[in-house]
Amino acid sequence: FTIDLPAELKGVHMSRLVESMTEEISNQFRVHPSIEELQIKILEGLAQKHPFSRGEIKFEFEFGYTTRTPVSNKRTWEVCNVTAITRKENETPYIHEVEIEVIGNTVCPHCMANNDGLTHIQRAIGKLSVIGETAAVPKYGSMIDVIEKSFSSKTYSLLKLEDEMLVTKQMHENPLLVEDVCRNILQLAKEAFSDRDLEMFAEARSLESIHKHDVIAQGRLVTNGY
C-alpha cells in the first residue's frame, strides 16, 4: 500500500490499510474477474476508512498456467512472475500497471554464422509491462503468449527426450539476439493489443552462457486503440 497523508493527520492509520485489504480478500462470497478489479475494491474500501487523494496498491506473485509438451503431449505446469499495480488519484480513472516475466532462450546468430553452425545457447528472461485503464489491460495469458513467441523457442518445465530434440531443433532454426527478442515482444504486443490505449515496455535479458555478464535490451511503444 502507498497513500498520501492529508495535512491534518499526524500519521497514517496502519490498521485501516490492512483491514481494508483483509476484508476484501477474505470475502469468500465475492468473485473478482481480475486482480485489477480486486485491487480497485481494496482501494475503494480503504477510501471509506482512511482519507487520501492518491493511493497505490501493489501485488507481486507467481502465476501458474498449464501447457502441453510439443511432441509427447504431456501436460505441464509453468510459472511466471507477475507484478500488478493499481493507482488512484483524486477523480481520475484507475490506472493499472502489469508486468509479466517469462523464461525462454536465445541462440547467438552471429557465432552460428561464423562458426560452421556451432553457437552458444542460454536461458533468457522476457518482460512485458502494460500501463492503462481497467478495460484496456490484457488478459495475463495473452501477455504470456506474446513473450513466449518472442524467443528462439519456448521452454518447458517438463520435457521428454523427443521434446528436447524438437526444442533444440527449433532453437537452432530461429537464432536470435537479445535485441531481437525485445523487438519481437513489442511487435507482437502491438499486433495483439493495437485496439487498446496502452503504454507498453519490453525487456529481454540473456543469461549469457560463455560470457561473465548478462545482456539486456529494452524498448517502449504506445498504442492508441485505432
What does each of the following model-derived ranges do?
Residues 1-226:
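N-terminal intrinsically disordered, cationic/polar leader segments
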